[in-house]
Amino acid sequence: EKRLVLHQMCRGQLGEAVVADGVDKRAFYTGEQAKITEFANKVHNGEIVNENGEKFTTVCQIGIGGSDLGPRAMYLALENWAKANNTFKMEAKFISNVDPDDAAGVISTIDIAHTIFILVSKSGTTLETLTNESFVKDFIKKAGLNPAKHMIAVTSETSPLAHNPDYLAAFYMEDYIGGRD
């Protein structure tokens, strides 16, 4: 791909500025982290709620490959610690397989009305992720709910998912995430 590898810019300790294409990537990611933190706090304290005015209790991430493995590993590594330290906020589920039985199995374990879904696709065109999004949206609609009130996107600013009214919010990553030198 002949791009910088800057996935480390998503971490909490960003260090020095990294300038690429004339843009301070550290400033970009610091801003995105602040937006994500603000959104998460609003979900946890009940400022962002479902269409019935009720808090979300579960988060379900839809992604594949790198859009699934890191967040899943982090959740599994920290879940018991968070529970032991009384900082556990929400149960997390993950949909990353295009087998409809797998997605249906995950969906069957959640209370759809109290679940917020995170769709993760850098390009916004990943077929497997979009297939699972369609499956989940159908399930939300069958429950008499509005998918736009239950979904957020994590994508690049140039993706079809960006600035899209079908999502409560969108958070951005750069093309340098997953880049190869």
Whereabouts are the PLM-identified features?
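Extended, charge-enriched "interface" segments that sit outside catalytic cores
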Residues: 1-51
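Glycine-rich phosphate-binding loops that contact phosphosugars or nucleotide phosphates
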Residues: 38-45, 53-181
